[in-house]
A protein has these predicted regions:
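Compositionally biased, intrinsically disordered low-complexity regions used as flexible
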Residues: 1-2, 189
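Bacterial N-terminal signal peptides that target proteins for export
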Residues: 2-12
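Coiled-coil-like amphipathic alpha-helices with heptad-repeat character
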Residues: 4-5, 20, 83, 300
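Carboxylate-rich, polar loop motifs that coordinate divalent cations or form catalytic acidic clusters
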Residues: 10, 27-393
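Bacterial N-terminal signal peptides
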Residues: 13-21
Length: 393
């Protein structure tokens, strides 16, 4: 097999050491939700070609780190890890690492993208940061500037110019994207929305039709439309019932055992007797397809789809490789990619494709991040690195 990025693989081997040492210097809290490592050996994971000869993978290692976000920016690929932000230039296989030494307030990067033209990073404990690409300096925004919490999971620029920021203490709305005007910062919480926002831990954001903002939280899905809040949880159809998934729950390390926060959630749902990682109210991933349907990835309750009237849930019995959904991504061609705890699958024409796993070339079976290039190449992030899938090549 011809590997186009063999030079980059060598530079990434060097970078792995950089990231490991960076992680030692700046201790980043463990990722949330907990991560299960792939069981594949290094040999199985390295530059493996898919069984389908039309599909090719190249692996880029980043050491003992999670890849939590990827952003394809023309010829540049930005990779957010638990050990810093990597900028990779596909034109010459060069890379640069941004971390605490570069001006970031945290090495844990959970969001990377462009907001109002600026390279933007949401971090794990370091707030929101914008990169001045000419000077290489970071402009940081944290709680004193109006941010609800220092833990930032997602950022969305709405068509009306407002910027929404998902945090662990509610969701910020910056009117007109005026970050330097404190009066433009608003924070929505469970308390000040009177329960309209079902939980203050917000993981995902997306703008739907007519400017509707959708939010994925630890207490279910929320919708903000024309100043009004609505929400859905398991009792309103979100996530598959435990009886449907109980025999296919991979993670036995229930967060409720170690966290009073999660234990209380399960108690409120009547799930105290369920001693595995299952909480269908806990929505980790969110995407909206071309039809306007809303997709929600749950913690053990499979994948749920809202068509404007009701929620329908899909599980391993319907073709998913796993019931813990970590990432949802809409490809250039409109195909929905679903990253799970047991591989990667697509949804198109009302059915799931055959799953891709480490046996087919994925770096690991846990898929945490995805991004597409203009040519519809797919970059897939997992624990330890990124797999570059060149579709149709």
């Amino acid at each position: 097999m011809s590997i186009k990025h063999s030079k980059f693989r060598k530079t990434m081997a060097v970078l792995a050491g950089v990231l490991i040492s960076a992680g030692a210097r700046a201790q980043v809290p463990p990722s949330h939700p907990p991560v299960a490592l792939s069981g594949a050996s290094a040999t199985q994971q390295e530059a493996k070609m898919a069984a389908n000869a039309a599909t090719k993978f190249t692996h880029f290692r980043v050491g003992s780190k999670n890849v939590k976000s990827i952003f394809v920016d023309g010829a540049l690929v930005w990779v957010g890890t638990s050990g810093g932000l990597v900028r990779y230039d596909t034109r010459d296989d060069s890379y640069k690492l941004f971390d605490g030494k570069s001006g970031l307030l945290s090495n844990g990067v959970f969001y990377v993208g462009r907001i109002n033209g600026r390279l933007t990073v949401g971090t794990y404990g370091g707030g929101l940061s914008f990169l001045d690409e000419r000077s290489g300096k970071w402009n940081n925004y944290n709680i004193p500037e109006g941010l609800g919490d220092a833990f930032v999971y997602d950022v969305v620029a709405a068509k009306n110019g407002d910027v929404w920021i998902a945090t662990w203490s509610g969701v910020n709305r910056v009117i007109g994207g005026a970050f330097d005007d404190r009066s433009k910062w608003h924070l929505y919480t469970v308390e000040n929305t009177k329960g309209g926002l079902p939980n203050d831990w917000v993981y995902g954001l997306a703008e739907g039709r007519n400017g509707v903002i959708w939010l994925a939280t630890e207490g279910g899905m929320a919708r903000f439309a024309k100043g009004r809040w609505d929400n859905w949880n398991h009792s309103r159809g979100l996530g598959a019932p435990y009886e449907k998934v109980k025999d296919s729950i991979e993670f036995k390390n229930d967060p409720g055992r170690a966290s009073s926060h999660h234990a209380k959630q399960k108690e409120e749902m009547g799930l105290s007797n369920v001693d595995v990682a299952f909480n269908p109210n806990y929505v980790i991933a969110l995407e909206i397809d071309r039809n306007g349907d809303v997709w929600a990835g749950t913690w053990g309750g499979g994948l749920s789809r809202y068509d404007g009237k009701r929620w329908v849930s899909y599980t391993t019995s319907d073709g998913l490789p796993g019931n813990h959904i970590f990432m949802l991504h809409l490809g250039v061609d409109g195909k929905l990619w679903i990253g799970t705890n047991s591989g990667l699958v697509t949804w198109q024409n009302e059915k799931f494709s055959k799953p891709l796993t480490v046996a087919d070339g994925l770096f690991a079976n846990n898929v945490f991040a995805m991004a597409s290039s203009a040519a519809d190449d797919l970059w897939v992030g997992s624990y330890g690195g990124v797999a570059h899938l060149r579709l149709g090549k």
